[in-house]
């Protein structure tokens, strides 16, 4: 019996060490907040003339409680309150204010300073909660659901949008959410070439599958250890 317990403890320790190793790999290689690369400063990101990947995590220009178009921002920017936020910094539209509702509308904006030679770029958006319009260089590039509060219709989906750009490019995302657990943009958008953005999407899917398989393995192992312990006690 002591030998069985010894082997069981060694197996538990091995599974625990494996779990810690997997979580560390997720933190090291799938953490968009700690990934290398330039970040925006006060809503402006300088994109070098290379094929690098940019995780748009920091200092988005954010207009709370309102849906704006690029034209409205251009013409009346001084009339609207804005602040700089990081993606995922807050779990809702309340911006950490406990007296406000976590639901509502908001507009995110970032300016890209691109190389002078025109290139094709892609921006990957993961599950924005729960309806939005994406504008690039003043044009409506895509829409999920309907963020208009009076005609609200949610639609949550991973999407990739491509565009040609050089010089200066403006990204505007107008978002509305009425009842999700987390509101607004909670997952870091990624900017790169279309090929790299799609590779990253594929890797993220693979990591999710591996994580689910590992979780299932731990569950089966826990049931096995429970049944084995019951037999030993009997």
Across the structure, where does each feature detected by a protein language model lie?
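Core alpha-helical transmembrane segments of integral membrane proteins
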Residues: 198-234
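Extended carbohydrate-recognition surfaces in non-catalytic/accessory domains of CAZymes
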Residues: 2-117
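Solvent-exposed beta-strand/loop surfaces of large extracellular or lumenal domains
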Residues: 77-88, 139-158
């Amino acid at each position: 019996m002591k030998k069985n317990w010894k082997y069981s403890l060694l197996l538990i320790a091995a599974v625990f060490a494996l779990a810690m190793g997997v979580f560390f790999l997720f933190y090291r290689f799938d953490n968009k907040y700690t990934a290398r690369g330039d970040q925006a400063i006060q809503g402006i990101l300088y994109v070098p003339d290379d094929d690098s990947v940019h995780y748009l995590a920091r200092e988005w220009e954010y207009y709370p409680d309102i849906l704006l178009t690029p034209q409205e921002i251009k013409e009346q920017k001084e009339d609207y309150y804005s602040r700089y936020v990081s993606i995922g910094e807050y779990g809702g539209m309340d911006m950490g204010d406990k007296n406000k509702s976590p639901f509502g509308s908001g507009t995110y904006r970032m300016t890209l300073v691109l190389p002078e030679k025109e290139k094709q770029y892609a921006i990957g958006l993961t599950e924005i909660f729960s309806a939005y319009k994406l504008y690039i260089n003043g044009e409506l590039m895509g829409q999920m659901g309907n963020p208009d509060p009076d005609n609200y219709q949610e639609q949550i989906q991973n999407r990739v949008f491509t565009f040609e750009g050089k010089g200066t490019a403006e990204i505007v995302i107008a978002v509305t959410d009425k009842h999700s657990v987390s509101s607004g943009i909670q997952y870091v958008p990624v900017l790169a070439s279309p090929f790299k953005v799609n590779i990253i999407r594929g890797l993220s899917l693979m990591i999710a599958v591996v994580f689910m398989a590992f979780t299932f393995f731990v569950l089966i192992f826990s049931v096995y250890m429970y049944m084995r312990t019951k037999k030993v006690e009997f």
